[in-house]
């Protein structure tokens, strides 16, 4: 059995804790019955032995599998990770979603996506991360009475994600501590209006509106101060043809969107100016979690 989950870019522009989308960097796990427990890990995080010894996927998988099956079995877990760790691309959400989906699939129990989404909420309280991981595409999401309420919109093939991944992380916990305890009425209105406009731009596919709608006063400028070169990355991306350029999650990755025809020039400009950072040009993912038995 094989399960894959896409990377996500959440806190999209002004959409703090409510807007997110999925891109086609994926984490994949193959699970096989075995006589004893074993783990192999390739790709991102392969050089970190702690991920084998203290694996969040296996912990969540075992909890669900034992509750569903009421028996103990051994498995071989083969991980192939494309999502950079601790860089604001939803690697934790991918682990949570894939672990729960795998436990149900191994037992042959059909799991509706909405139920999977709400089971994942117990481990990840921010719906802008887990919703695109499950559903793919662009998502507007909130939590109401312990359930995720969302609207999903596929993203056309004519657009690409251009992702700049710095060589160091920004801690999510530390990143949240940089945010103000209170916001002014002006900044609050700014973000409500801009997140509304950003949502409308995605839903109507008015891509030229993104450069205005993606502005933010609530979180990006505070978080990006921890890595000031991100301001220059953002400025360069917008100058070189990006439709929008925003911090991904809590950072340190910077996410940009561009027309397919412009994406390679944008990639080249970013690689030339920031050779110590990784730059990916990838499709958007409209599938979300995928299970192959």
Swiss-Prot record:
Annotated GO MF terms: ATP binding; homoserine kinase activity
UniProt keyword annotation of Nucleus present: no
Associated pathway: Amino-acid biosynthesis; L-threonine biosynthesis; L-threonine from L-aspartate: step 4/5
GO cellular component labels: cytoplasm
Domain of life: Bacteria
Keyword flag Coiled coil: no
GO biological process terms, semicolon-separated: threonine biosynthetic process
Keywords: Amino-acid biosynthesis, ATP-binding, Cytoplasm, Kinase, Nucleotide-binding, Threonine biosynthesis, Transferase
Binding residues annotated for ATP, in chain numbering: 84-94
Signal peptide extent: none
Family annotation (Pfam families): GHMP_kinases_C, GHMP_kinases_N
NCBIfam families per the UniProt record, alphabetical: thrB
Family per record: Belongs to the GHMP kinase family. Homoserine kinase subfamily.
Protein name per its UniProtKB record: Homoserine kinase
Organism listed in the record: Aliarcobacter butzleri (strain RM4018) (Arcobacter butzleri)
Gene name tied to this protein: thrB
């Amino acid at each position: 059995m094989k399960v894959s989950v896409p990377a996500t870019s959440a806190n999209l522009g002004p959409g703090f804790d409510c807007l997110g989308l999925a891109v086609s960097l994926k984490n994949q796990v193959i699970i096989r019955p075995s006589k004893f427990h074993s783990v192999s890990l390739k790709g991102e995080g392969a050089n970190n032995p702690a991920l084998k010894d203290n694996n969040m996927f296996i912990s969540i998988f075992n909890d669900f599998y034992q509750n569903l099956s009421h028996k103990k079995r051994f498995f071989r877990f083969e991980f192939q990770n494309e999502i950079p760790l601790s860089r604001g691309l939803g690697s934790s959400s991918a682990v949570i979603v894939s672990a729960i989906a795998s436990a149900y699939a191994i037992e042959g129990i059909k799991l509706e996506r909405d139920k999977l989404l709400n089971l994942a909420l117990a481990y990840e309280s921010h719906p802008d991360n887990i919703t695109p991981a499950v559903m793919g595409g662009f998502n507007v999401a909130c939590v109401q009475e312990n359930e995720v309420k969302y609207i999903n919109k596929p993203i056309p093939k004519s657009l690409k994600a251009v992702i700049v991944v710095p060589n160091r992380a920004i801690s999510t916990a530390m990143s949240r501590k940089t945010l103000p305890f209170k916001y002014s009425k002006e900044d609050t209105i700014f973000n409500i209006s801009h997140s509304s406009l950003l949502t409308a731009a995605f839903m109507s596919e008015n891509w030229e509106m993104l450069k205005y709608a993606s502005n933010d006063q609530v979180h990006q400028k505070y978080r990006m101060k921890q890595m000031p070169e991100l301001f220059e990355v953002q400025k360069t991306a917008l100058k070189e043809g990006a439709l929008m350029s925003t911090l991904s999650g809590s950072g340190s990755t910077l996410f940009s969107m561009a027309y397919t025809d412009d994406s390679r020039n944008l990639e080249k400009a970013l690689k030339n100016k920031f050779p110590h950072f990784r730059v990916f040009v990838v499709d958007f993912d409209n599938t979300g979690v995928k299970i192959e038995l």
